[in-house]
């Protein structure tokens, strides 16, 4: 198998920097060069990790899954009291433990990474989550010391 057109390494780097998703050939195999999306405007608020599809899939899953948990088990069913919010927090903590066990997130601290509080209105719940997604190995920087 071959990827076409054949690109120089400098061209590959340039295209990836532009947010291009591309295929390259190596040892008769075609592979995705890197699992990125088109996001290229990095900042302190949205660093380079936001250009990585694996990271975005984790972030999207967290938002969707916690929304589903809240809607299916808590809306209209559980009081917005300290006890009710603690039940929800326990559910979120279990979810993140599972996410860490499947290597979707890392360095999760159940004592500090989830805060659930009442919002400004009686029916509002605020859930702040501090997570670190796991990404794939893609780059190797290696030093070799020769002894002659």
Language-model features: where?
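Structured, hydrophobic secondary-structure cores that serve as assembly/anchoring elements
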Residues: 1-148
